[in-house]
Amino acid sequence: MGLIYGDRRLRLVLIYDKNSQCDRITLIREHLPDRNTPERPSLTLDDLLGKWEGEAITIASDWLEPEVMPTITEWRQDGDRVIMSLQMQTLRGAQTITSIARLDPNNPQILHFDQDNLPIQTLFLPDGASLTCPIAIANRQPFRLSLSWLLEPKLHQRMIRTYDAKGEWTSLTLVTERKVG
């Protein structure tokens, strides 16, 4: 997965081992030659807290017309719990997805989401990036991977790839949001 912004590009390679466990993550950060593009600091939860508004563009694997929808994302912290609420206005009406995570007690750069069939983790990475992925992939279970990048203090992009129970790619969503509160 990869994102481009200005003269910078961020790519991520995620490898699961033969036991379907998340094994290796390679974050590739690039910029055009002869540019003094400063690297952004590692992403933190504090960078995300608040209200974000923008839009999501989803392309399905059948390559039909992309679906564009407005989004509102809110991040809140309550002790060691983190609540992320995503509101989207889809063709089927308003949809709200709320996810609750807990901070890893040994590493503040990791969030654990446990309410799904697959345990999910978010890893805060260098250069304002983060990865959200299953800790392990289960046979015949659909899953999502998400690469996020804080491009500027109040501008955030997220690419979400969705896979079906056969492991086939079904959709790709690009979310671009600005912090409004």
Residue ranges and their predicted role:
Residues 1-70, 78-83, 90-95, 140-143, ...:
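Amphipathic/hydrophobic helical signal segments and adjacent flexible N-terminal regions
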Residues 145-147:
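Beta-propeller and closely related beta-sheet repeat lectin domains
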Residues 1, 64-138:
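Central antiparallel beta-sheet cores of small beta-barrel/beta-sandwich binding domains
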